[in-house]
């Protein structure tokens, strides 16, 4: 069975992430969307909230699992018996960092491949940070995130 991991913070999940999830799920028998616990970051949503939002927006993709991890991605990949890592690339600026990470991961685990998927052009500008900024100022989110995510964002910023 070919298994891939799509790691990220997903704070929050956007239509750009969902596009990569759908396309990645078509390439592998199983796709694990793995929320990274990064102690140096202060996310808007807890890991539990991010996992629940991801489950809500991927419930209809049968070969997608949602999980979370901390530590090294290569260690997590070994634990879940993943063959590959999927990374979405929006712009050339994403490539330099992601390529460096792919080389490091390959050095740490030579059997683990990184697959780069170019984002759909309509999501090339989209990031979780931009979505949070729009939400903070009460802007319309319908082009960027599913309704459930927009609702949760508005709840966070109305407190």
UniProtKB/Swiss-Prot annotation:
One GO-annotated biological process of the protein: coenzyme A biosynthetic process
Name of the protein described by the UniProt record: Phosphopantetheine adenylyltransferase
Enzyme's top EC category: transferase
Annotated positions binding substrate: 9, 41, 73, 87
Keyword Nucleotide-binding recorded: yes
Listed GO CC annotations: cytoplasm
Subunit comment: Homohexamer.
Source organism: Thermoanaerobacter pseudethanolicus (strain ATCC 33223 / 39E) (Clostridium thermohydrosulfuricum)
């Amino acid at each position: 069975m070919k298994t891939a991991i799509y790691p990220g913070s997903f704070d929050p999940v956007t239509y750009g992430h969902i596009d990569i999830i759908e396309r990645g799920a078509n390439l592998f028998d199983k796709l694990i969307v793995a929320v990274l616990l990064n102690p140096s970051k202060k996310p808007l949503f807890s890991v539990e909230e991010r996992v629940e939002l991801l489950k809500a927006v991927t419930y209809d993709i049968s070969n997608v699992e949602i999980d979370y991890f901390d530590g090294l991605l290569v260690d997590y990949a070994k634990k879940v018996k993943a063959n590959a890592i999927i990374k979405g690339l929006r712009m050339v600026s994403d490539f330099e960092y992601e390529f460096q990470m792919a080389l490091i991961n390959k050095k740490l685990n030579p059997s683990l491949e990184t697959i780069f998927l170019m984002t759909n052009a309509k999501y090339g500008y989209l990031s979780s940070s931009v979505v949070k900024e729009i939400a903070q100022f009460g802007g319309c989110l319908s082009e960027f995130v599913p309704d459930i995510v927009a609702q949760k964002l508005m709840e966070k910023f109305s407190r």
